[in-house]
Amino acid sequence: MVQWISPLDNSIVIASKVKILRNIKGIKFTKLLNEEEFNDLLSMVLGRLKEIDILDKCYVVKLKDGEEKIIDYYKENFGLIKYFENKDNLIFIMNKNGEFNILLNEEEHIGIECTNSGLSLREVYSKVDKLDDLIEEKIHYSFDSELGYLTSNIKNLGTALRTKVFIHLPLLSSNNLIRIIKNALKEEGITLKSIYNSGNKDVGNIYEVSNIKTLGMSEKDILDSLISITNKLILREKNQRDNLSKDEYIELKDDILRALGVLRNTYSIDRDEALKYLSYVRLGVELGIIEDLTLKPVNSAMIEIQPDMINNSSIKRRDIQSLKIERAKIIRNALNT
């Protein structure tokens, strides 16, 4: 499993993720392929990947047939479950060691992605780039000398590189600075958004920082920009923590320990309340207030309590009350061991 769940330190940055998108020269975009054309594409790509010994180290799973392994995939990739338009034809090629994943027929013909803990964008990109170079030796990509890599979505033209950092910003969020920061980052071609929401409200204080532009920038420029922005966010969050008054710190410490007490003893809890308290607990670990926990069980709990994750682990879909009870059980098991 990818190591972001077991971080090496109590970092504010949870994980870094890089994804590159590629289309194959002379083949219609994914959304335009019929069943026969897709099967031809799949056969060709898998054949070429065998030639470079990638598949020996991977699981090859169709989304509609491999639910259990796909659940593990989402856990490894920060639990971002979404619904795919072309579910029947989506293929996951998952490295057995969790080093990378290749998606066939998702947004484009080929998507190569990797996730790892902390602020490690350059290291993660290096892995993806090496794999991309290997594949390109066997497959001719759609490329234009002026536009770069050609994609069905104009937003991905150019490098077709997507970079993301997942970061915990509880103090910036509680002081209502997030909206101001979001607007400022848009001007720099960066998106900041909560990965968990309830209506229009951010929940859980975990944010995704990602690049918007892929055209007109080099891969190095994109990586440098996101790393620079992330470091500024880290500094601003740390400043908020360091500048707490004595009374504010006491109040925060009380909130953290109350949250830990609730989560370790709750019998039934809804998702939003659980994420709120897990954010407090995570902050407590980051600040050294909670000493008998690491971030690993907190990270795992944040993923496993999502409704889709709970339902996917059950034979039948649960009702709301059953979900709340099972969610509380997951949290108790995570935080009491």
Curated annotation (Swiss-Prot):
InterPro entries with a match to the protein in the record: Arg_Kinase, ATP-guanido_PTrfase, ATP-guanido_PTrfase_cat, Gln_synth/guanido_kin_cat_dom
Residue numbers binding ATP: 15-19, 162-166, 193-198
Pfam family, one: ATP-gua_Ptrans
GO annotation terms (biological process): phosphocreatine biosynthetic process
PROSITE patterns xref list: PHOSPHAGEN_KINASE_C (PS51510)
The keyword Kinase belongs to this UniProt entry's keyword annotation: yes
Family: Belongs to the ATP:guanido phosphotransferase family.
Protein name in UniProt: Protein-arginine kinase
Source organism per UniProt: Clostridium perfringens (strain 13 / Type A)
Gene: mcsB
